Each structure stands twice: as C-alpha cells, then as structure tokens.
C-alpha cells in the first residue's frame, strides 16, 4: 500500500471517494496481481488469454447490458467470455475492484494521528497472543458474553453499509453485478458448498466483504469497551492490531458518543474486555449477571436497527467463568479455583493457612478432536487407531512425514494446554495409525513392523522443542514433568489448526 499511495495521489477521484475511474488504470491490476509495474499484466500473453484496457472497458459495458446472456453465435470472443473465459475475466476485474475498495480504509489509517502509537509487531498476528491476554484479565472477571456474529440476511444490506465509506454509486453497482453473477449469492457468508467456487476465484473480494462485515459488527464492541473503561489496558489496545480496519475506530467513537450518550449510563463497567477470532467474539466483564443481560439485548437491538438484521438471542450466551467452559479458538477455557495450604510457624505456634487462588485453565477438546481424526480416517469414533488406506500408495518416507507433520502441528498448537494427557492420547492415535498404515502397505504385523523400525520412527512425532528439552532435562526427574505440564504459548501461529476447526 505504501507504493500504491504514490499512484493514487496522482488521481483526483479518490479525494471524494470516487473510485470507479481507477478500475481503468493499468497499475491497479499490476498491484492486484503482484506484478512489476514495468511489466504490463494487461499486455501479457499466456496461452489464449490476452489483457488490455479495451478488454476491461468492453467487459464492464457488457456486464451492464440487460441482454448480456443473448449472444451472437458468430462472436467467438463473446462465447469465450461467457464460456470458460468468463470466470477468468470476472476474477481479473474483481481482484482490481477489491484493491480499489480497500483504499478508504487505508487512507483513514495513514491519516490517523494515532497511527504512530499503535505497536507494529508480527507477534500480534499470532493466535496464541490472545491467551496471555486472557490469563492476565480473566482471573479478575466474572462473566463472559459468547457472541456469534450474525450473517447478513441479504447482501444488499452490506452494499448499503458500504455507502458510508464509498460514495461512488458506479462502484457499488459494479459490486452488485459481481454478487448477482453467482447463484445463491444471498448465502455468501454461510459456509455452503454452493459458494466454494466464488470464494476460490474471488478470494480477495470475499475476504474484504467478510472483514468489512465483521468490522461493522465489532465496532459496537470496541465502542462499549472504550467508553466504559476508565483505565484502558495496554494489552487490549495492542490486540486491536489484529484487525486491519482499526483506522475507523476514532470516527465511530465520535459518531456513537453523539447519538448514544444518553444510553451509556446503563453500561458503565470498570473493566470490559473484548476479543474476536473470525465470526466469534467474547465480551468479558466484572459486572453482575443483570448487567450482562443488558449488554446482550442492547447488542441485539443495535444490530437490528443499524444493520436491519434480526439476531437470534441464542447466538449470544452468558457464561459464568467459575462454572462454565468457554469454547474459543480450539480450547475449552475456564477459571479454576486452586487451593494451597501454607504452613506458618511463629515461635512455638504453628498455623495452617488455606489460600484459594484463581488459575486460567485451557483444556484440549478431546472429544471434538477425536471426531475430527475419525472423520479424516485416522481412527474410529471411539478413538481406536486405524490405517489410512488412502495413503498406502505413497512411499514410506512420505507416509511418516505426513503423520509426523500432523502430530507436530497438534503439539505445537496445543502446547498451552495445562493438561497434557489429552495431547498424549492424540499423538498415540497418530503414531499407531501411521504404524498400521505402513504395516498394511508391506503386509506385515504392526508389532513386527515397529520392532524393525526402532526408535527412529518415534522421533518423527516429536517437535524440535521436545527434542531439545529431552536432552536438557533429566528423564526421571520431577522437574521435567512439571515443566512439560506448564503452558507454553508460541507467537508464530497465525491460524487455528484444521482439526480444531471441524464444523
């Protein structure tokens, strides 16, 4: 975007949020496809695919025609477009259009006076950066709102919402054409197979629409936290780096402060905290159960009035941290009370002091993961390992490498769990499944095959950290087991593990 800024400054249209003329600029498609500006992508030839500005202009004109499905049989170019080339040209324009509609958010970001105060760190992209935040804050909170962000009932509502950011009617009409081009476009945000090809061919446009949709819903959560919190936490501010549209927050605060100043007295709370991952958000508070009910219905009514979307009350759950587990990004997290007895002696008198402390306890959802392994044909529904028959035709090294990679990724992602027995069970299932797959391939017994491979076979299922720790720590010492039992969060995990995201 830094390189892109120099080009959009040459255009006068962006100053008034008129972006439609930019789609005819050649450098837009160069940036969208990651090509060098010195090498024109619109003049590049790849097989029978030719690019030119004339193609783009004719394509948009043809898309606006009401009789675009009535084509001449003698026009081979038109038949090619509405045949196998239709998807390609549509993808090309949608990529350029996606880059253009991102301009308002980028301009707000570079114009924000607070941009220098936001910490730039790649570690903030890690999912595991959320858990130290939860460990620090959840011990002092009581209740959590478990929120599933609602899907739009009609994408026309999303287009209307974009009007607040993009004032160019031509760009909005072009967006409607992209959406109406596909069947079941009203179900764009619902995970169905009918929209798989739309997402595959238009990833950038799909991600922009989804992020914008989530950002609009999440803005009210940021507003509540900013207005209600008297002592703003630095860790909370750092987590805002995880969203790419934080530049609009200052504008929203001014808008909401003017319109909702008389309502906020109902929601004063000294310590609300909000965290989101994909379409799920949590809003934790130290307030009473009655206050959480107020927040719940306030969010429902606000979304209904602002987005014309009726959100079912069951999509927002109120959980007590002391009695319920929070299902979030692949962990069952809760706050447990741990008792410890301290012996104190003063002269000849001895006292036993019973201390109760809170401890953040993230658990592995073992039942869900076993179901995911069973779905992937690594075991049955009861957790008994079976052979992976699909991989029998692969070489031995490829089979071991695939099983080992899955096992290491699971160990890496769930290293923060306080209870490692569930993780050991998952690793055991993968080890035996790998052994049975190899034994089935070579038509031998599992026990005899494991005996022939020896200990080198098991090393493929250990992470690099586990190999180092096994050399440093004593094997029979109690300290080694205590160290492995602790939580270890890594700052290089940018997405949830696929097995933990089984839906």
From Swiss-Prot:
Keywords: Chloroplast, mRNA processing, Plastid, RNA-binding, tRNA processing. One of its GO terms (biological process) is RNA splicing. Disulfide bonds: none annotated. It comes from Silene latifolia. PANTHER family: MATURASE K (PTHR34811:SF1). The keyword tRNA processing applies. The lineage of its organism: Eukaryota, Viridiplantae, Streptophyta, Embryophyta, Tracheophyta. Transmembrane segments: none annotated. Coiled coil: none annotated. InterPro entries: Domain_X (IPR024937), Maturase_MatK (IPR002866), Maturase_MatK_N (IPR024942). It comes from the Eukaryota. The keyword RNA-binding applies. Usually encoded in the trnK tRNA gene intron. Probably assists in splicing its own and other chloroplast group II introns. One of its GO terms (cellular component) is chloroplast. It is found in: Plastid, Chloroplast. One of its GO terms (molecular function) is RNA binding. It holds the Pfam family MatK_N. Its main location: plastid. This is Maturase K. Belongs to the intron maturase 2 family. MatK subfamily.
């Amino acid at each position: 975007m830094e390189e892109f800024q120099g080009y959009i400054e040459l255009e006068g249209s962006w100053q008034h949020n008129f972006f439609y003329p930019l789609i005819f600029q050649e450098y837009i498609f160069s940036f969208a496809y990651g090509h060098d500006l010195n090498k024109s992508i619109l003049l590049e030839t790849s097989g029978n695919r030719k690019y030119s500005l004339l193609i783009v202009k004719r394509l948009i004109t043809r898309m606006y025609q009401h009789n675009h499905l009535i084509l001449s049989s003698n026009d081979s170019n038109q038949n090619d477009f509405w045949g196998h080339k239709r998807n390609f040209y549509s993808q090309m324009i949608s990529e350029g259009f996606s880059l253009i509609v991102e301009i308002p958010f980028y301009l707000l970001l570079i114009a924000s006076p607070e941009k220098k105060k936001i910490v730039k760190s790649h570690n903030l992209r890690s999912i595991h950066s959320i858990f130290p935040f939860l460990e620090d804050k959840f011990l002092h909170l009581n209740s959590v709102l478990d929120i599933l962000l609602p899907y739009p009932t009609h994408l026309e509502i999303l287009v209307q919402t974009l009007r607040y950011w993009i004032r160019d009617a031509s760009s909005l009409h072009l967006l409607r054409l992209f959406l109406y081009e596909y069947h079941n476009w009203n179900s764009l945000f619902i995970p169905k197979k009918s929209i798989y090809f739309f997402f595959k061919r238009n990833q950038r446009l799909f991600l922009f629409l989804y992020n914008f949709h989530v950002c609009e819903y999440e803005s009210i959560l940021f507003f509540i936290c900013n207005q209600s919190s008297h002592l703003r936490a630095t860790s909370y501010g750092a987590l805002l780096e995880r969203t790419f549209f934080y530049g609009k927050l200052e504008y929203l605060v001014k808008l909401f402060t003017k319109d909702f100043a008389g309502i906020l007295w109902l929601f004063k709370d000294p310590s609300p905290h909000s965290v989101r991952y994909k379409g799920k958000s949590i809003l934790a508070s130290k307030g009473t159960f009655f206050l959480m009910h107020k927040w719940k219905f306030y969010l429902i009514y606000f979304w209904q009035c602002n987005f014309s979307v009726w959100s079912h009350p069951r999509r927002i759950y109120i959980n007590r941290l002391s009695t319920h587990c929070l299902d979030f990004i692949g962990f069952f997290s809760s706050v447990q009370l741990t008792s410890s007895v301290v012996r104190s002696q003063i002269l000849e008198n001895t006292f036993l002091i019973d201390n109760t402390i809170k401890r953040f306890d993230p658990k592995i959802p073992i039942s869900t993961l076993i179901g995911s392994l069973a779905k992937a044909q690594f075991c049955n529904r009861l957790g008994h390992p079976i052979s992976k028959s699909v991989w029998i035709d692969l070489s031995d090294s490829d089979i071991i490498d695939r099983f080992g990679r899955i096992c290491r990724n699971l160990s890496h992602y769930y290293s923060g769990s306080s209870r490692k027995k569930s993780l050991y069970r998952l690793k055991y299932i993968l080890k035996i499944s790998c052994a049975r797959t190899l034994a089935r391939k070579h038509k031998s017994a599992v026990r005899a095959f494991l005996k022939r491979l020896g200990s080198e076979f098991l090393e493929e299922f250990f992470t690099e950290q586990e190999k180092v720790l096994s050399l440093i720590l004593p094997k029979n010492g109690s300290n080694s087991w205590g160290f492995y039992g602790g939580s270890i969060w890594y700052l290089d995990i940018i997405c949830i593990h696929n097995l933990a995201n089984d839906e």
